Amino acid sequence: MKSDKITLRNMVFYGYHGVFEGEKELGQRFEVDVELHMDLSVPGQTDDLEQGINYVDVYTIVQTIVQERTYDLVEAVAENIAETILDAYSVDYVVV
């Protein structure tokens, strides 16, 4: 199976995640990188966005999870990002 990679790097958001109360009250800056692994031959050949991944939608998924939800662990943030992308797109795997 052919696998290509799309990487969105250095997405910066302000969120309220952490185990300590101060982290949740004050918030902090989070920088997120996401790798999407899949076969991109069809969108590459057809030049059709509907056959591929809309980067704006992926960015919005990450933004929503980081900015609008609260988690104790950064691992939970990453897991939720990965699961949401896997549910939304036909990708082989996601690295956050």
Residue locations for each model-derived region?
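N-terminal, polar/charged subdomain of small-to-medium soluble alpha/beta proteins
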Residues: M1-V96
